[in-house]
Amino acid sequence: MAKIGIKCLTYAPYTSGGDGSSISYGTGVQLVDYMIRADVTEERGDVKFYADDHKIDSENSMTGASLGLELANMTDDLEKAFLGYVAESTASGADLLVTDAAAGFVGCGFYRKERFKGTITYKCYWFYKVQFSKDGDSTTTKGENVDFQTETLTGDALGVKLTSAGDTLYYAICRKSSESDAIAWLKTKAGIA
């Protein structure tokens, strides 16, 4: 399969739920021209059970997930939503304050375009509850040529339960046959009308 691209960063601030009830989000946002890379990593238990000198069982259930994002532009709004930075009005404009408060939680997703045997599909991801941190902020001087520099975030996906008897969920995946359907699915997840 060919992975042809990634688009449509969509997010909404987490407000409540996921503890046996549906999740509520604040106002959702869908961005264009932001996604460069997404790294989805599943964390799994790795326990083996031995008897009579050989392995008779194993357990590898999912224990967590992480989402790494490389973005073309880290705006003030993204830093406030994803990292918990606080805006403060000053005489010279607005400043972003980096405080000791923990970053808030967001639901977020994106889609990637895939091609297999000539058929195009759009694989959508939605992470129910993620807490992001910035992977540093380094800058280099301009040399003979401009060097594009981007920022990366790492998000810790927390498990949620949408029903009292339900499984722990970290993220949802959905395949759509058209780009417009992929965009609509993400908007629905983020509560965007």
Regions found by a protein language model. Give the residues of each.
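Solvent-exposed edge beta-strands and adjacent loop segments
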Residues: 1-80, 131-147
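Structured, beta-strand-rich domain cores
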Residues: 57-125
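Mixed-charge, glycine-accented linear interaction segment located at domain edges/termini
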Residues: 132-193
